[in-house]
């Protein structure tokens, strides 16, 4: 017999989903049969599987050691990845906010290169709050060449909270970008977003009269706000706020108005500087008013400075850092 005590990180999950992750090789039909026969019990009583787990709940599994080992699966040694570790900006028992450097993937892709997710799981591996039924994960993915703030969940409760904040478009997400051409003032950009998956390229078409086409079932509405921080003859540094959050949204939206990111070849930009030239940084995250379990984050604002290489790039482009100020 094995006894499992539910900790805070796993609270809120359905019992059957928890068991499917814990007994990863067991068919769902087998798990439900074991529940009916009381070979698996919740708080010493029969359970159906749809119960929501609470911190302190006890699950008892009446299997032999061999049966339990079979359905648990063979332990696989964790991969030790090689990466540039991101700096931690904020951490509590449920979430992490890190500063991802340019060039590091947020999540692993087909290339198998290391990512923020790899670092996160290594970082949390020896944490007493980690479990076999929840894998810490990145919640807002940034492109490889985009640097800045990435939200990560350490627990199930943290994952659910961050997912709700992102899906509800209540989280303030602000970026800095170096774009080609001279811009002045501020503007709101609205359009329909289309993605060519094969080419991994996005196009955004301006909405006629500012009203979405309800008959267009393929295009997705996107909205980007920008204001100019500093401008020179050939370049401008802008602050952008995402109302929606689609893949390549900033890159494609700025390109659609004739001001692509400097160095963003895919969207029509040209190289600027000898080393890295694409400057797109997620530099500020603002939480809305929050009550309940995560009220500690209510109204909190997290902000990071430009990396040194970006300051040098702005100087090359004729934008003095003193002009950028604290945006």
Regions from the language model: what does each represent?
Residues 1-327:
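RNA pseudouridine synthases
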């Amino acid at each position: 017999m094995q006894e499992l005590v539910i900790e805070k990180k796993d609270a809120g999950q359905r019992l059957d989903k928890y068991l499917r992750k814990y007994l990863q090789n067991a068919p769902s039909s087998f798990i439900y049969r074991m529940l009916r026969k009381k070979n698996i019990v919740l708080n010493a009583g029969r359970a159906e599987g749809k119960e929501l787990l609470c911190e302190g709940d006890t699950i008892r599994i009446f299997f032999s050691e061999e049966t339990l080992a079979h359905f648990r699966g063979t332990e696989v040694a964790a991969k030790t990845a090689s990466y540039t570790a991101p700096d931690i900006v904020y951490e509590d028992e449920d979430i992490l906010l890190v500063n991802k450097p340019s060039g590091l993937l947020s999540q692993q892709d087909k290339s198998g290169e290391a990512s923020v997710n790899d670092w996160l799981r290594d970082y949390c591996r020896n944490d007493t709050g980690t479990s076999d039924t929840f894998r810490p994960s990145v919640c807002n993915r940034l492109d490889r060449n985009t640097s800045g703030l990435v939200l990560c969940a350490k627990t199930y409760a943290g994952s659910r909270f961050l997912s709700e904040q992102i899906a509800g478009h209540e989280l303030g997400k602000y970026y800095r970008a170096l774009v080609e051409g001279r811009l002045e003032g501020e503007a709101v950009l609205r359009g329909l977003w289309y993605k060519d998956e094969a080419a991994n390229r996005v196009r955004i078409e301006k909405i006629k009269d500012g009203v979405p086409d309800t008959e267009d079932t393929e295009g997705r509405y996107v909205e980007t706000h920008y204001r100019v921080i500093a401008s020179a003859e050939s370049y401008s540094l802008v602050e952008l706020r995402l109302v929606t959050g689609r893949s390549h949204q900033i890159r494609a939206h700025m390109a659609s108005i004739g001001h692509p990111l400097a160095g963003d070849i895919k969207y029509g930009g040209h190289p600027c500087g000898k080393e890295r030239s694409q400057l797109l940084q997620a530099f500020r995250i603002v939480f809305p008013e929050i009550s309940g379990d995560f009220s500690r984050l209510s109204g909190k604002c997290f902000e990071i400075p430009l990396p040194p290489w970006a300051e040098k790039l702005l100087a090359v482009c004729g934008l003095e850092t003193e002009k950028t100020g604290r945006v």
